[in-house]
């Protein structure tokens, strides 16, 4: 069944399983999740649930935003995202009332999830670092070392051409990650492997889309 929650990446650690194998773990704080809005196919044309995460001071919000939070009877939130659901597929969030707090028991250890976040920004980078292209000769007399080389005779710009430019700071989705364990007391998810973004970066955790589609086909 489809579901999702917002969180903040705390950092990485490691644990050992019963066989003594080392497992890299990312810790995600999922406390303070509140439902802000419900969108339906009849009214909005698509099915989704809007969530808010991480409270902030009222003076940091605009008046329209404060009215939006007031409708949900909650404090202003720093990170707001919509989790969209495929029509005809059951989900656990659409029937919940506005202002409902989501807890860690929404997911269970062993669940397979997709994690969406903003990758670390690397600034302006050359094509060798950005696209893993080969370097030129390093010997004396060579005309280029790390330049991108000829762009070809085609006139104008070509979309998707591998050139120097902004690297990182893009929305990245990692699929089929496993929730290794859950700390219900501190409201933490321990996810196997790494996830996008720096420490303290916001992420969205959803039931793996491939799992949802497979369950729907089997049903």
UniProtKB/Swiss-Prot annotation:
Q: SUPFAM superfamilies from the xrefs?
A: Translation proteins
Gene3D superfamilies (alphabetical): 3.30.160.810, Translation factors
Which Pfam families does the record match to this protein?
Answer: Ribosomal_L3 (PF00297)
Q: Which GO terms describe its cellular component?
A: cytosolic large ribosomal subunit
**Keyword Plastid carried by entry:** no
Region named Disordered: 124-154
One example of a Gene Ontology biological process annotation: translation
Keyword list (alphabetical) reads: Ribonucleoprotein, Ribosomal protein, RNA-binding, rRNA-binding
User: Which molecular function term from Gene Ontology is one that the record holds?
Assistant: rRNA binding
Q: Could you give the subunit structure recorded for this chain? A: Part of the 50S ribosomal subunit. Forms a cluster with proteins L14 and L19.
Family classification: Belongs to the universal ribosomal protein uL3 family.
The record ties this protein, via PANTHER family, to: 50S RIBOSOMAL PROTEIN L3, LARGE RIBOSOMAL SUBUNIT PROTEIN UL3C
Function field: One of the primary rRNA binding proteins, it binds directly near the 3'-end of the 23S rRNA, where it nucleates assembly of the 50S subunit.
HAMAP family tied to this protein: Ribosomal_uL3_B
Indicate what this protein is called per its UniProt record. Large ribosomal subunit protein uL3
Q: Organism, per UniProt?
A: Phytoplasma mali (strain AT)
Query: What is the phylogenetic placement of the source species in the record?
Result: Bacteria, Bacillati, Mycoplasmatota, Mollicutes, Acholeplasmatales
